[in-house]
């Protein structure tokens, strides 16, 4: 089974450029330096249609869905509750209206409690409102695979735990590719879950150390441990110019850019 992956956004929490703060070290003339907040689209296609799974709903989701010409989603996976990964959740409303069906979303216990406190109206009509809910909630747990059905066939996602400052985030393995957008470390079970992957899309926030994200050097160290055939760095801050960063990386490692597509 070959899946197609689209980097919907590869920027850090403020994106690139940032309001009032600009482009940082990034060349504004290179389109690959314009970065929306991180998200990943996974697609499986056959003669009957396409199955689509989205990872995270960043604040830029509306533009991301328009650019990728997404008119339906069979499932949405949430890596964790931080604003840059959840605050575009209301943009799923258009998908629900178009499909005339609730959008299936998958969250772990901690993420669900925070997201439902912030966006409860997406899951249940609040008192005094006439607006129907737009989401159907499903619980997920690290280490337990999820099968999401659709017209193009089933997509299997294996969530795995990641250390992300004072919380745990989730990474996801889809067949030969794994996605680790926000992390500072991996527990042993998650290292085992990454065994034998071909492609790893992995957090590399900046050159300087950070308390809850891999630096570029830490990402490269972990890539050396996991040993994917190919690695793609994401969640890139404004001090990481695309061409300057790429020139420093090993041949099997490259920076992500918005709209990048991978098959695995």
Question: Which residue stretches match the model-derived regions?
Answer:
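Catalytic metal-binding/acid-base residues of hydrolase active sites
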Residues: 60, 82, 184, 205, ...
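Binuclear metal-ion centers of metallo-dependent hydrolases, dominated by the metallo-beta-lactamase
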Residues: 143, 187-264
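Thr-Gly-centered strand-to-loop micro-motif
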Residues: 159-160, 180-182, 202, 233-234
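A conditional alpha-helix N-cap/helix-loop micro-motif detector
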Residues: 33, 58, 183, 209-216
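Binuclear metal-dependent hydrolase catalytic cores
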Residues: 1-180, 189, 246-264
């Amino acid at each position: 089974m070959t899946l197609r992956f689209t980097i919907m956004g590869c920027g850090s929490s403020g994106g690139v450029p940032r309001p009032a703060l600009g482009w940082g070290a990034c060349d504004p003339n290179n389109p690959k330096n314009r970065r929306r907040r991180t998200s990943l689209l996974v697609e499986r296609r056959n003669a009957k249609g396409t199955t689509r799974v989205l990872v995270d709903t960043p604040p830029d989701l509306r533009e991301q869905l328009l650019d990728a010409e997404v008119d339906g989603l069979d499932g949405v996976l949430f890596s964790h509750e931080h604003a840059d990964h959840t605050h575009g959740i209301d943009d799923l409303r258009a998908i629900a209206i178009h499909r005339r069906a609730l959008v299936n979303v998958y969250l772990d216990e901690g993420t669900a409690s925070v997201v439902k406190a912030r966006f409860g109206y997406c899951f249940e009509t609040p008192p005094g409102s006439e607006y129907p809910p737009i989401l159907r909630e499903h619980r997920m747990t690290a280490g337990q695979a999820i099968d999401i059905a659709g017209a193009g066939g089933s997509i299997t996602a294996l969530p795995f735990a990641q250390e992300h400052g004072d919380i745990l985030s989730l990474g996801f393995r889809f067949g030969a590719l794994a996605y680790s957008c926000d992390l500072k470390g991996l527990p042993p079970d998650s290292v085992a879950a990454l065994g034998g992957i071909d492609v790893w899309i992995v957090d590399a926030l900046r050159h300087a150390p950070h308390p809850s994200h891999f630096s570029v050097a830490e990402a490269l160290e972990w890539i050396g441990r996991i040993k994917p055939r190919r690695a793609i760095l994401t969640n890139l801050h404004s001090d990481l110019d695309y061409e300057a960063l790429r020139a420093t990386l090993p041949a099997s490692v490259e920076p992500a850019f918005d709209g990048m597509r991978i098959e695995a």
